[in-house]
Amino acid sequence: MKTPITEAIASADSQGRFLSNGELQAVNGRYQRAAASLGAARSLTNNAQRLITGAAQSVYTKFPYVTQMPGPTYASSAIGKAKCARDIGYYLRMVTYCLVVGATGPMDEYLVAGLEEINRSFELSPSWYVEALQYIKGSHGLSGQIGNEANVYLDYAINTLS
């Protein structure tokens, strides 16, 4: 999994040299942001259920047909609603994983790679998850550097789905 730290080390090692001042500065920058990133991951994790429930409700409000259409890919039943919440939770978990490592690697490797195929196979609309992630971004209650760190990966997920 690529992170700013592993990329700096891999580059130096492939050239048989020590880390350059620029690479050391990049590593130091990651360490300086790490506390804010971990704070964001902790807060999103602690508030996950509230955020997921609110995000699902936001999807149902913006796309009411989701709760009216029968079938396994819609939220017209308790099972469908549980699947929707599960999927939103998956995106939120990926955001927290990215916050922990300080890079988009977890999302790229575990989510983005097969996203289009999954959505097509199960007839899932990316716009549902864009709405859910926008709700989470607007409702997480994080501010300052902690909020900025969370928003980097929420925006990345939103842009990937758009």
From Swiss-Prot:
Residues passing through the membrane, by range: none
Alphabetic keyword roster: Antenna complex, Bile pigment, Chloroplast, Chromophore, Electron transport, Membrane, Photosynthesis, Phycobilisome, Plastid, Thylakoid, Transport
Predominant cellular place of this UniProt entry's protein: plastid
Localisation per UniProt entry: Plastid, Chloroplast thylakoid membrane
One of the GO biological process terms: photosynthesis
CDD domains: PC-PEC_alpha
Topology with respect to the bilayer: Peripheral membrane protein
Top-rank taxon, per record: Eukaryota
Gene Ontology CC: chloroplast thylakoid membrane; phycobilisome
List of residues binding (2R,3E)-phycocyanobilin: 84
PTM entry text: Contains one covalently linked phycocyanobilin chromophore.
Keyword Thylakoid recorded: yes
Family: Belongs to the phycobiliprotein family.
Record's subunit section: Heterodimer of an alpha and a beta subunit, which further assembles into trimers and the trimers into hexamers. The basic functional unit of phycobiliproteins is a ring-shaped hexamer formed from two back-to-back trimers contacting via the alpha chain subunits. The trimers are composed of alpha/beta subunit heterodimers arranged around a three-fold axis of symmetry. The phycoerythrins also contain a gamma subunit which is located in the center of the hexamer.
Function: Light-harvesting photosynthetic bile pigment-protein from the phycobiliprotein complex (phycobilisome, PBS). Phycocyanin is the major phycobiliprotein in the PBS rod.
UniProt protein name: C-phycocyanin alpha chain
Organism the protein comes from: Porphyra purpurea
Lineage: Eukaryota, Rhodophyta, Bangiophyceae, Bangiales, Bangiaceae
Gene name of the encoded protein: cpcA
